[in-house]
């Protein structure tokens, strides 16, 4: 049935535990974050919600989010005074699924969570200690061998800027160009042995961040020196890349518009 009423665009910011899902995008072989969110929107709005939501990035299976952004349209719009009630209802329905909708705001019709993004920040967490992990399983990459973050920072400096990142690109990546500009990479280690790596860019190739982290880890543990790291970057060949870091340590932290 055609609805002869206007449709309003909305943006939501989402936090989720990616370990329970096949990824962000709708898939036939399992539960996706996109699918679970669409279910609760449909449950509230029925026929007034007719189009798939659009995410700022299609996070892979096991990848988490602290600030994923998405947009969708509702025919007839949402009463502004009911947004808080609506958030509470959605989060009640999503609570056991490991998903939380943090905020909702009205956007103009041209806003697109993916295409309108100016900057994305990904956070990668490494727990660098010999002892086993009790609290952060499926939340960090546990690396027992001590990593030299100073040499990792030198590698990160080489990755910063505009490059052909074919080395770090998944074979299934559909991006038209491997050229990307990394605006900033920061690496910090806290007292508990947790290393936090942040990557900032307008966009990334599929598995690019995890592949870069894998190479930086090789550098930090001494398997590679800076020369080998540079050769890998400049080769533009996937075969020269270290094994990608596991999905469990990766978080889509925030998206800027």
Residue ranges and their predicted role:
Residues 2-257:
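Structured-RNA-binding interfaces characteristic of tRNA pseudouridine synthases
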